[in-house]
Amino acid sequence: MVPSDPNLSTMPRSFAGEADWIALSDARFFGSGVTLSAADTKQPQTGLVHTGLFVMELALPLAGAMVLLNHQYDQGWPRTFAVFHDLAAGLVILHRQGKSVVRHVLPGPIPQGRGTGRLSFRFDAPARIWEMSFEVLGSDPPASVSSSGRNPFPFHLADVKEICSAQRANGPVLWFGLTRGAAPPARAPWIGQRTPVETSLGPVPAGNLVPGTIIMTADHGPLPLLARHNLTLPARGSFAPILLRAPFFGLRQDLLVSADQLVAVTGAEAEYLFAEESVLMRAGDMVDGRTALTDQRRAVIESVALDLGRPALIEADGCLIATGHHAGAEASLRCLHSYEVLTLMALLGRTARRSA
């Protein structure tokens, strides 16, 4: 059956963990095979990122003038990377290397509102061009502004490491990161590493599954696991995961999943509204503050996406979860639109029923 909502496909175009992340805030983590030697730290010009994308997500609305990020290195060859906001001036990135200073400006006022805003700064030092944009995520109509200019500096890996490892004070910055990709990773379905997945040997934590493990599915019987994709992602802002509370979903334990993860719900209410015994709902659409919660307690999440070679429904502590990563395949259940989820949740008294 083709999903009702094409945006709710269980097959993401690419895995969210494959976005060439170099570093993420609040994490002593480097991806994409980037390593730093002692020489790189002492002589940062030996480790450079010439092209890439700096991304920062912010909790809106922003107050008046404030410093969003401020990295200062004053020993030897001085360097600065700072991000400022001002209601009138807009957003400013100040980048200093030695005696040279550049300012990249996104003139204000920037779009405000409530929710999450994303600042994107794309730089190409060899081509001597940069682009900066700010958007209010999920706004209707879309709210965004952009600017561009010339002569950006490359990023020094030693600075990136320090910026992303430093402790930050509480403020509007939800997370930030540097990637070699042209855009941040698309959000995609995933499950937490501790999710108990039903196998031929009983429940096994998702993070411990290995290729060849026989996964017990509700719609296609036993299937061998082809691959387990380990993902390291931001866990705040637009990437914040959803905590599905027991016993409303899992029988005995809470389940941590992506906001885009599809969860099966079965009951007379689903059949009454949609003439389907079971339907799939996006976890993010089920947030009600009681049975399903947005969880932003951690900065970075280690999660997994399972590849069974086809879309399938796996069981996690009594809750059926959709998985599948092959383009062109079809989910076995109808996927509800966001407004349909609201209707069903209201009929359920906003108490989600797990799939039996």
Over which residues does each language-model region extend?
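Sequence-level preference for short, compositionally simple segments enriched
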Residues: 44, 52-56, 63-64, 96-98, ...
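Glycan-recognition/cleft segments
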Residues: 69-95, 146-152
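A carbohydrate-recognition surface predominantly in extracellular/luminal proteins
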Residues: 16-67, 119
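Flexible glycan-contacting loops in extracellular carbohydrate-active proteins
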Residues: 143-168
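Short tryptophan-centered beta-strand motifs in secreted/extracellular beta-sheet-rich domains
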Residues: 115-123, 132-134
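Long beta-strand-rich cores associated with HINT superfamily self-processing modules
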Residues: 192-199, 218, 222, 226-328
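Structural motif
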Residues: 207-214
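Short, aromatic/His-centered strand-loop micro-motif at the edge of beta-sheets
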Residues: 96-118
